[in-house]
Amino acid sequence: MDSKKIILVIVVIIIVAILAFTYISANSHTSKIEVESNKTLKNGDSFVVVLKDDRKNVIPNQVIDFKILDDKGWATKYNATTDENGHATVKLFALENGNYTVHSVYNGTIFLSKSKSISDLNIDDGYDKY
């Protein structure tokens, strides 16, 4: 293959790469996780978040990772897939009464940015743990 053909192939590859980058940039959106649950729940209740884009459209069929940390730093991990309304739900169980921090993370896609939410949660089943 002569040098003119090689240069032509390289130019075509560069143009395709620029067009792909432009398309992805023009169609990319930021995402946001919004907590819909109360700050005080009990075992058996559900912790619910909704995933939305920058236009406030809900985002279905995406995985949200949850990490619930107690006061001592011990973590319980869950994941849930958003439904047709953008809601991801985790049913809480076997958590002692007390304060927790919930980290909710969406890892994004090629068209949606990664997002996370950190929220406080209090588990109160109506009894003392001692």
Per-range role (PLM):
Residues 54-79:
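Short flexible loop/turn segments that cap and initiate beta-strands
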Residues 76-78, 82-90:
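Glycine-centered loop-to-beta-strand initiation motif
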Residues 100-119:
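Enriched for extracellular/lumenal, surface-exposed ectodomains of secreted and cell-surface proteins
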